[in-house]
Regions:
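Conserved beta-strand-loop-alpha-helix junction that forms the acyl-donor binding cleft
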Residues: 151-160, 182-192, 208-209, 219
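Conserved acetyl-CoA-binding loop-helix of GNAT-fold acetyltransferases
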Residues: 152-157, 161-174, 196
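Conserved active-site alpha-helix within GNAT-family acetyltransferase domains
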Residues: 166, 178, 187-204, 208-211
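A short helix-loop-beta-strand connector motif used in the catalytic cores of GNAT acetyltransferases and
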Residues: 60-84, 143-146
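Conserved beta-hairpin
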Residues: 76-97, 154
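Conserved N-terminal entry element of GNAT/NAT acetyltransferase domains
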Residues: 1-29, 33, 37
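Conserved GNAT acetyl-CoA-binding A-motif
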Residues: 146-148, 175-186
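Conserved acyl-donor/pantetheine-binding loop and adjacent beta-alpha core of acyl/acetyltransferases
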Residues: 96-154, 160, 208, 212
Length: 220
């Protein structure tokens, strides 16, 4: 009696943090493209990005998010972080996470808003105003105290089931060093995933014409 050979173990996932002073523009674009692929079927994202040239729009959107995560303050302190999950065997990018650090300014950043407006309009078109309203509501839902904010986390479809997303979130939890972590889940089905990582739901942000965002918080 014979049995089929067991499937070979899948290569491990490593998580790396990009250095703001060492991340080149092509790196930002590569990571942005990975996130664009990860969110290519996300209902919330697609509801705010016109169908025309949607692929390039998504890549521009997430490349801008990566650049934002790599920025530093006037004193050189990082205002965010960008982590990437890679296949330990061949270095293939599997996913990424973009974070805002406790050092980032809160409230309305008028210069930043104006600087980012051309990209927002190019990506979101007629949905730009709706997006800004949702973002303002998300800002109001964030904790008042110091915390890390998980802006984006996603993995490419071929990497799902390998633990890359969990590894990315856990990496950020360790970096938080006892501070809370806050995020919004755009799809209700992903809430249990975050709950398994220790998050708890704290409220919702309404999305006109779509599912509300679920606010979640993790505390050490």
């Amino acid at each position: 009696m014979t049995s089929p050979d067991p499937a070979p173990p899948r290569p491990r996932v490593h998580v790396l943090t990009l250095r703001p002073d060492g991340a080149r523009e092509d790196t930002a674009r590569r990571v942005g493209a990975v996130l664009a692929e990860a969110f290519a079927t996300d209902p919330y994202t697609l509801g705010l990005v016109p169908e025309d040239r949607r692929g390039p729009r998504l890549e521009r959107k997430f490349t801008a998010a990566v650049r934002q995560g790599l920025r530093a303050g006037a004193d050189g302190a990082p205002l965010g972080a960008v982590d990437v999950a890679v296949d330990a065997a061949d270095g293939t990018l599997l996913g990424a996470a973009v974070w805002t650090s406790p050092a980032a300014p809160r409230g309305v950043d008028v210069p930043g808003l104006l600087a980012g407006l051309p990209t927002a309009v190019a990506v979101h078109g007629r949905h730009t105003l709706a997006l800004k309203r949702i973002q303002a509501a998300c800002e109001r839902a964030r904790p008042a105290g110091r915390h890390w904010y998980l802006e984006e986390v996603g993995t490419v479809p071929s990497a799902r089931g390998r633990g890359a997303a969990s590894a990315l979130v856990r990496h950020g939890q360790r970096r938080a060093s006892g501070l809370p972590v806050h995020l919004e889940a755009s799809v209700p089905a992903t809430v249990p995933f975050y709950e398994r990582l220790g998050f708890r739901a704290t409220g919702h942000v309404p999305v006109p014409g779509g599912e509300p965002l679920t606010c979640l918080r993790w505390e050490a």
